[in-house]
């Protein structure tokens, strides 16, 4: 959102509107203004030869206004799309947390992006308490066990369990054999 404002406009463009419906209404309003300016530009340019039109200050000012309106519309479209995407993501995350299944938001966003692009990279995480959800199936997540990152390939059977269950923190080397104890005593 900040990138769009930096590139195309200013905070004055938003005029204190911060909800999605308000931003969409503002976008529609700016699109109408842009269409009206384009019509005015066509009317002003109609019938004039190119050389005569270049020297006309009124026409130049109109062109500047059209360019400014186009930049504002582009910025608003980017902002509205980002806000819409954020609200969808937030609604899904809220629904997930209402079911008492904790999922690390950063890990979840990374997995979602990889699902969209079709990428399959190993994702490293310290979040052992994250509940495995169906979106994670097919990915390899490296879970920290206190010392190293243990790669865990997520299968359908793991859904509902925690990531930490599959990355043991202790190494069990087995019970000592009884024959060794007996030999020591003798």
UniProtKB/Swiss-Prot annotation:
One of its GO terms (molecular function) is rRNA binding. One of its GO terms (biological process) is translation. Transmembrane segments: none annotated. GO terms for cellular component: cytoplasm; small ribosomal subunit. Pfam families: Ribosomal_S19. Keywords: Ribonucleoprotein, Ribosomal protein, RNA-binding, rRNA-binding. PROSITE patterns: RIBOSOMAL_S19. Residues 1-95 are annotated as: Unknown. The keyword rRNA-binding applies. Residues 96-186 are annotated as: Small ribosomal subunit protein uS19. NCBIfam families: rpsS_bact. HAMAP family: Ribosomal_uS19 (MF_00531). Protein S19 forms a complex with S13 that binds strongly to the 16S ribosomal RNA. Belongs to the universal ribosomal protein uS19 family. This is Small ribosomal subunit protein uS19. It comes from Aquifex aeolicus (strain VF5). The lineage of its organism: Bacteria, Pseudomonadati, Aquificota, Aquificia, Aquificales.
